[in-house]
Amino acid sequence: MNHLSGRKIGILGGSFDPIHNGHLAIARAAYTDFDLDEVWFIPAGHSPNKNESGMTLPEYRAEMVALAVKPYPYFKMSTVEIEAEETSYTYLTLTKLKNRYPDTIFYFIMGADSLDYFDEWKHPEIICEKAVVLVAVRDHW
């Protein structure tokens, strides 16, 4: 039996270039408001929506995220997207996680600005199938 069976895990993805207090506030609110067991921060490896030429290298962004989440025992950093060779599409990441941890309930956390064009994402229906979608409204914090 896997150690995440039946657990509620929040997923907060992004370029995190850099990670900032807003990301941490969104994660804390989701953790508290939805009684999550953990929130996993997932830095994008090859983001479909960003020009990577000016971005900080993925391993450095992962290091920044790891340092930022270290004080919080319920925050974790995952390199699942950085380790992947393909473009970091959310539906692929959630599919991988759901295959690894089939009994875990995932909560995908996104900002309200992303909701405006969520229907343009690659396979939003798979995202909704693999996770509960939480939308963070900025004026909440």
Kindly give the residue locations of the regions a language model identified.
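Nucleotidyltransferase catalytic core that binds NTPs
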Residues: 1-141
